[in-house]
């Protein structure tokens, strides 16, 4: 909004001219989201405590240390969605189609997560909305997003770019629709599975969002895209502002989510954040790079898939003491803080590997 209001005055005002730069607005987005989080956090937590008698239900088969988390409110993802959306509406170019499509997906996945959190709190168990119903809703939202991209972007490509290789792209043609939906839904649920310890998912999400802030900026800039031999996609640079807002909102949320957590993001936060990262990767044509940068999410999801299939195939045997993987290490005696920090380190490594693909070809 501010960008659109100040745009006519960029040649007459130094301040207005600053808003012409994506980098300035992105930095401002981080400051604004942090400020909103710090101000609204205590108010929201108090409000959620008053509404949730028992807080987020704690799994009875989980690590013993988790019993101390009983009574901690959930749905803290509302704080992340609120601050991110407000900063984007304030600072991004509101004539940009990618901004509106991404915000639509972000909020829609947040609503699905809210429904799941509400069901858990109301029933006082950790089951929530049925898995099939959740997948169906996520699939429908992802399909709508894909149709919007196809309809609003006449040059929307079905090519799948392969990182670390020059000019290597696979034309998925009509299958790209299925692939795009898989990326968005998969990303949403992968982040959701990772969000099992205080602060565990928050920092890797911030790393991933920060990485895609850079990717969006480079892909949307003709000079940089040509230099790095990336697929140039006009107008994607504005997503940098949104990604920067996600970084700030995650850091702001971490202030309250660090161990011992005062609030959990819940599915409201994890499904929406995972979904929005998937959407941005599809728009910027960096779907495989998302799997690299978000490698921690992939590992956590894979551990669950392996555990479930092995359990069924062997009629009761397990590969891990508990899945997702972070619980396995807890069961091995690792302190929660050690698991979280070591997983953060792994996330940094994956982010660096993913970003290196922009240059190493």
Swiss-Prot record:
TM regions (residue ranges): 28-48, 74-94, 99-119, 133-153, 168-188, 203-223, 236-256, 263-283, 288-308, 338-358
Subcellular locations according to the entry: Cell inner membrane
Reactions performed catalytically: UDP-N-acetyl-alpha-D-muramoyl-L-alanyl-gamma-D-glutamyl-meso-2,6-diaminopimeloyl-D-alanyl-D-alanine + di-trans,octa-cis-undecaprenyl phosphate = di-trans,octa-cis-undecaprenyl diphospho-N-acetyl-alpha-D-muramoyl-L-alanyl-D-glutamyl-meso-2,6-diaminopimeloyl-D-alanyl-D-alanine + UMP
Pfam families: Glycos_transf_4, MraY_sig1
InterPro entries in UniProt: Glycosyl_transferase_4, PNAcMuramoyl-5peptid_Trfase, PNAcMuramoyl-5peptid_Trfase_CS
Superkingdom of source: Bacteria
E.C. numbers: 2.7.8.13
Cofactor entry: Mg(2+)
Gene Ontology biological process terms from the UniProt entry: cell division; cell wall organization; peptidoglycan biosynthetic process; regulation of cell shape
Record family assignment: Belongs to the glycosyltransferase 4 family. MraY subfamily.
Function: Catalyzes the initial step of the lipid cycle reactions in the biosynthesis of the cell wall peptidoglycan: transfers peptidoglycan precursor phospho-MurNAc-pentapeptide from UDP-MurNAc-pentapeptide onto the lipid carrier undecaprenyl phosphate, yielding undecaprenyl-pyrophosphoryl-MurNAc-pentapeptide, known as lipid I.
Name of this chain's protein: Phospho-N-acetylmuramoyl-pentapeptide-transferase
Organism encoding this protein: Rickettsia prowazekii (strain Madrid E)
Lineage: Bacteria, Pseudomonadati, Pseudomonadota, Alphaproteobacteria, Rickettsiales
Gene responsible for this protein: mraY
């Amino acid at each position: 909004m501010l960008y659109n209001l100040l745009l006519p005055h960029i040649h007459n005002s130094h301040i207005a001219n600053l808003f012409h730069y994506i980098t300035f607005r992105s930095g401002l987005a981080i400051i604004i989201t942090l400020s909103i989080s710090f101000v609204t956090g205590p108010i929201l937590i108090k409000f959620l405590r008053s509404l949730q008698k028992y807080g987020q239900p704690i799994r009875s088969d989980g690590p013993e240390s988790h019993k101390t988390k009983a009574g901690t409110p959930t749905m803290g993802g509302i704080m992340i969605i609120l601050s991110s959306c407000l900063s984007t509406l304030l600072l991004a170019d509101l004539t940009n189609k990618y901004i509106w499509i991404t915000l639509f997906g972000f909020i829609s996945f947040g609503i699905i997560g809210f429904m799941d959190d509400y069901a858990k709190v109301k029933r006082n168990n950790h089951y929530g909305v049925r898995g099939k119903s959740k997948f169906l809703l996520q699939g429908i939202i992802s399909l709508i997003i894909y149709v919007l991209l196809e309809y609003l972007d006449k040059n929307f490509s079905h090519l799948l770019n392969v990182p670390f290789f020059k000019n290597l792209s696979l034309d998925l043609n009509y299958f790209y629709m299925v692939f795009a939906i898989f990326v968005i839904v998969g990303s949403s649920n992968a982040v959701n599975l990772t969000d099992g310890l205080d602060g565990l998912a928050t920092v890797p999400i911030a790393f991933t969002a920060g990485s895609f802030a850079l990717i969006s900026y480079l892909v949307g800039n003709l000079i940089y895209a040509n230099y790095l031999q990336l697929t140039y996609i006009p107008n994607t640079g504005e997503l940098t502002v949104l990604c920067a807002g996600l970084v700030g909102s995650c850091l702001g949320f971490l202030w309250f989510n660090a161990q011992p957590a005062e609030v959990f993001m819940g599915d409201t936060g994890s499904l929406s954040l995972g979904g929005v990262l998937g959407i941005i990767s599809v728009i910027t044509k960096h779907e495989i790079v998302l799997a690299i940068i978000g490698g921690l999410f992939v590992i956590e999801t894979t551990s669950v898939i392996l555990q479930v299939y092995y359990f069924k195939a062997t009629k009761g045997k397990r590969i891990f003491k508990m899945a997702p993987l972070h619980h396995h290490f807890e069961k091995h005696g690792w302190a929660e803080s050690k698991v979280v920090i070591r997983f953060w380190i792994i996330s940094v490594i994956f982010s660096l590997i993913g970003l290196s693909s922009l240059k190493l070809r």
